[in-house]
Amino acid sequence: MYLTTNYCDFLSRTRIVRRIFLLVYLISNVYAYIVFTETGVLIGDYQGVLIIYKDQVVYLLMLTIMSYYIVCGPVFNCLSKVKIRLRTFKGLNSFAYILFFFQILFAVFNISTGSNAAGTDFQTGGVIRLLWLFLPVDYLFYIYYFVGREKKVSKIYLANVVIFILSMLSRGWLGWTLVLLYAELCFFFYSQKKIKIKYLILLFFLLIVAPLAFSLKIQLRADLYSSGIGGVISTLSNIDYIQSYNNFIAGFLSRIQQLSNIVFFYDHQQELYKFVSSDIVSNYAWEGLPQQTVAKLLGLDPGVDMHIFLYSHYISSTSEAVTTLQVGFISWLFLGTLSSVFYPLFVFAIICISLFLSKKLGGEKLCALTWIMIFLSIMCGWYNAYLVYMQ
């Protein structure tokens, strides 16, 4: 079986999907701004933290929205139009079986050690956990999900999808649903099918189930490894559906908005600049366990990862961090002249490299996947996730 890469109209036919995601993002940040003006405190990861420079919030909102539009709009569109000669690969079926094997190993490792789950300590799983940093099974699945999709879905394709979903649920993550939702919308609009009643029924079903899934996520985060499946069943049987739905909408918008992270970073920019300039905290280029691991092997000390530092220093200074906080795309621009010059160049470079590889290896379908990775990773300031995807 060949990996076909020539999807000439895939990006143009799926443009509406990217516009929908940008619109939802716009709504979430405007929602955050409204909450800020009414309460004077942040939401999301920084819920309850007082805003220091309230007069700058509207300015930061406009910067945030414009950054998303520029990077995910004109910059991506221009780079994706560059013509790259495609490569044709054989053996997609073989790759599918290999991926399925590694997905099972990854799931067994995570369940047996409690590693890679939402809210777990970063040291969980020991040295073996580093193997999965350089063999990113989840990202390999995303790539296969896009380039391996055909009109008639194979059994091994479905098997990979099932094991991926079960693996993600066992770890308490739900962010993957945005990637798969984006993918399915892309496939739907690319096929140019008419909207059928069954799709509307499916959409209605998903809207009904969403609050339950959100509650399930909370249960998995808190009690899966302590209470087991019994705790999940207990939560589901006592759900207040209306309250769950309200919590889901507010929680979803609070989670995907970036304004709260950017406002917090702006309020503390002078202090954070001192930490970065004195190498106590690393800059964007050293963000993530792979880079930090390489630095230690080379005998370097780039400083603490910014995302971990934000949590351990400002949110939970009395305990070791078990989570990370997003920075937001434009936040690094606030840390002096050098950062405001080299940071955009760094971002532009990794976007260029990733789009070149995407067009070379997977054509426009893989470029479409790269867009959602830019949307979810680069625009959140989550460069570790994006660089792992690139590898």
Residue ranges with predicted function:
Residues V49-L60, G119-F134, F329-L335:
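Short aromatic-rich membrane-water interface segments that cap or initiate transmembrane helices
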Residues G114, A118, V137-D138, L310-Q391:
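Hydrophobic alpha-helical segments
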Residues L212-Y343:
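Small-residue-enriched transmembrane helix-hairpin modules in multi-pass membrane proteins
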